[in-house]
Amino acid sequence: QRQMCIRDRDQINERMKQLRALSQSLHCLVLTVTQTDAAAYKTRVITRSNFSDDKRKLAHVTGMVGLNQTDEEKELGVMRLNWVVRREGAFTETTCVNVAGCLALGTPAIVSCW
């Protein structure tokens, strides 16, 4: 079981390195998603500490954005985005930008800025 877990982590790390190399060689945006830990369900803003499984994921990205939403915000169609990791420029993990719109139609609209 533990051996398989380590192999899975190594495969994910290799995939993240390959995606980073692809973005650099083609000078293009590469998007991917990842899951947080169970503690993220109880936090208002996702931070680096919510990715405890394998920190190597964070080492390969140029930027990682957290998607944050309470039940009330979900009913209102509002979501908060924050930088979890950002290689270029200063950032604060707990500073959020609010996004509202109709996500079912794929039309989020920024209603505040960082």
Regions found by a protein language model. Give the residues of each.
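Conserved D-loop beta-strand region of ABC ATPase nucleotide-binding domains
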Residues: 33
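C-terminal regions of RecA-like/P-loop NTPase motor modules
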Residues: 3, 10-30, 38-114
